[in-house]
Amino acid sequence: MHLHFTPRQIVEKLDQYIIGQKDAKKAVAVALRNRYRRSKLVENLRDEIAPKNILMIGPTGVGKTEVARRMAKLVGAPFIKVEATKFTEVGYVGRDVESMVRDLVETSVRIVKEEMVVKVQDKAEEQANQRLVEILVPSPEKQSGFKNPLEMLFGGNQNSNQTSDAQEDDEIEKKRQDVERKLAAGLLEDEVISIEVTEQQSSMFDMLQGTGMEQMGMNFQDALGSIMPKKTKKRKLSVKEARKLLTNEEAQRLIDMDEVTQEAVYRAEQLGIIFIDEIDKIAGKQSNSVDVSREGVQRDILPIVEGSNVATKYGSVKTDYILFVAAGAFHMSKPSDLIPELQGRFPIRVELTKLSADDFVKILIEPDNALIKQYTALLATEGIEIEFSDEAIRKIAEIAYQVNQDTDNIGARRLHTVMEKLLEDLSFEASEITLEKITITPQYVEEKLATIAKNKDVSQFIL
């Protein structure tokens, strides 16, 4: 975990991926730093301090989700994104709001499990190599077939067999040492062997996914899992592939799942972040039965946000110290349309601004994962070096901004559409082009995009 970052350092890290939106970055940076501060307090005071939940308000495509996602990734905290519109009131068919907490715990378990696997990786690989040696050179017990029970009982021919057994053991030991040496040198990587692996079975949980009955599926699966033995099947694989499978199996045996569960539940409770998107879609004044149902979802979310215990397959999980970040465009409604109790649970309000053409220019070139860097790297795999002139980048940004103004404003996501259309022909013909370097000029951008951008009816369908 990396909770030691100062708010300024967190903002600097977020700047590497997200352009603008300083207020939102500052809000999440302070929220993260407060978690670090809280961890330093004495226990009785620490229990009294709950995180201040954040409500992000802004149009689509301005970075609401990205800010929260990058924030969680930065500190390695369990993070999930859910959509408020996917939930239904308790008693109706669909997902209940408690499933977001169960999903968070599942994410936390996966993170902790991956960390534990890395810790035991060397030992797991060592044991996997021993299993490979055993498969390639079986021990005498496995090689020998039927033994005369009378001979075993009365020790007949015991003396005469001892010498031959000792010689056989020596020969096998030499073979095993030779195979170990070859495995270490990587000389047997392509050798095909037959191994037994644990069969992956489709779970009850998978069948009930999205029906609102996931918890029942998980409980049923656990009950069956403790009774039914695990199935194995034989597979023919190269030594290289077999080592990966066997290493994974050995790692799963080496890690203590009780320890994983305990740490995962702790992280979910103390460090977990739940991002609730589209919260504006469940806001609104009561006017019909649909709105009543939306208010019901808000009332179901309320106890989760203010702190309650949720039953999961890993035990009861407290939601008191989970950080909730809600977001919405609030085009058709406003934050005050949420029920007052829920409004009070999101004391930090942050408004994200619309993106300008200048912001689009920065988005195209400045972030570590900038779009132009992505497309340049993709086409470089075909042996083509692509260069965008500054004027061409400005032209792309202006066209994307103008299309947003003329049609629906989808923020930075418009750049993906524009870039795909711009490089469509080039991407299609890349494997056949003999030129080593191609420069994208404003004229090329104009030729590919300007006509479509100017025609409002066409741009609605293409851009």
Swiss-Prot record:
Residues 154-175 are annotated as: Disordered. CDD domains: RecA-like_HslU. One of its GO terms (biological process) is protein unfolding. The keyword Ubl conjugation does not apply. It is found in: Cytoplasm. SUPFAM superfamilies: P-loop containing nucleoside triphosphate hydrolases. Keywords: ATP-binding, Chaperone, Cytoplasm, Nucleotide-binding, Stress response. GO terms for cellular component: HslUV protease complex. GO terms for molecular function: ATP binding; ATP hydrolysis activity; peptidase activity; proteasome-activating activity. Coiled coil: none annotated. ATP binds at residues 19, 61-66, 277, 341, 413. Gene3D superfamilies: 1.10.8.60, P-loop containing nucleotide triphosphate hydrolases (3.40.50.300). Residues 156-165 have a biased composition (Polar residues). A double ring-shaped homohexamer of HslV is capped on each side by a ring-shaped HslU homohexamer. The assembly of the HslU/HslV complex is dependent on binding of ATP. Belongs to the ClpX chaperone family. HslU subfamily. HAMAP family: HslU (MF_00249). ATPase subunit of a proteasome-like degradation complex; this subunit has chaperone activity. The binding of ATP and its subsequent hydrolysis by HslU are essential for unfolding of protein substrates subsequently hydrolyzed by HslV. HslU recognizes the N-terminal part of its protein substrates and unfolds these before they are guided to HslV for hydrolysis. This is ATP-dependent protease ATPase subunit HslU. It comes from Bacillus mycoides (strain KBAB4) (Bacillus weihenstephanensis).
